[in-house]
From Swiss-Prot:
It comes from Acidovorax sp. (strain JS42). One of its GO terms (cellular component) is cytoplasm. The lineage of its organism: Bacteria, Pseudomonadati, Pseudomonadota, Betaproteobacteria, Burkholderiales. The gene is rlmE. This is Ribosomal RNA large subunit methyltransferase E. Belongs to the class I-like SAM-binding methyltransferase superfamily. RNA methyltransferase RlmE family. Specifically methylates the uridine in position 2552 of 23S rRNA at the 2'-O position of the ribose in the fully assembled 50S ribosomal subunit. Coiled coil: none annotated.
Length: 220
């Protein structure tokens, strides 16, 4: 009974914070599906990653807030329905409501067949930016979760190495904790410029952070 009472208090506190969250209100006002859009928006505004004409791949895209933001960046009319100057390919294991101009593939990025489908959708076009909001189902066991998180990020890095333009960029979500320093080193080994970032829209209580890699190093 005590555990249930504590759980109810936690859920009530989370709901209160969520309803009163500045970015939740802003997302509703500006038509974004989730407050996460403002994390990518801040990163992009600081670094100038996404530009009209770009080919962008969005990994872990559902519910679609990041793809919505990218679409607005690639459209002369912003959020309005109409012309799109660029290509957006989104992928998630979960379903995603359609977004005009976004090619969506549903599947598990860890499976070779799904990865092959993504590569086919890219059609050998050099990719300008890969953004990844992928996260595994967390078990609560840090050592287990660290391995799952690292695996997804390693797959994203491998995809970027094979598909990014030499001057392209990769943005990934990760969490401070076990394995963090190794993932930062992986980025440093792969990219010429590496920037850890904690956008304002990322909750203070969360260990969530983002790594941005820009400009591929020569491999081999």
């Amino acid at each position: 009974m005590k555990a249930q009472t504590k759980s109810k208090k936690v859920n009530k506190a989370w709901l209160h914070d969520h309803v009163n969250d500045t970015y939740v209100k802003l997302a509703q006002k500006e038509g974004y599906r989730a407050r996460a859009a403002y994390k990518l928006k801040e990163i992009d505004e600081q670094l100038g990653l996404i530009k009209p004409g770009h080919v962008v791949v969005d990994l872990g895209s559902s519910p679609g807030a990041w793809s919505q933001y990218v679409r607005r960046r690639l459209s002369p009319d912003g959020a309005a329905v109409g012309q799109l100057n660029g290509v957006i390919i989104a992928l998630d294991i979960l379903p995603m409501e359609p977004i005009e101009g976004v090619t969506f593939l549903q599947g598990d990025f860890r499976e070779e067949e799904v990865l092959a489908g993504l590569q086919e959708a890219v059609q050998a076009r050099p990719v300008d930016v890969v953004v990844s909001d992928m996260a595994p189902n967390l078990s609560g066991v840090e050592s287990v979760d660290a391995v799952r998180i690292a695996h997804l990020i390693e797959l994203a890095v491998d995809f970027a190495v094979h598909h990014l333009k030499p001057e392209g960029a990769l943005v990934v979500k990760l969490f401070h904790g076990s394995g963090y320093s190794q993932l930062v080193q992986l980025f440093k080994d792969t990219f010429r410029v590496v920037k850890p970032m904690k956008p304002k829209a990322s909750r203070d209580k969360s260990s969530e952070t983002f790594l941005v890699g820009m400009g591929l190093k020569r491999q081999g």
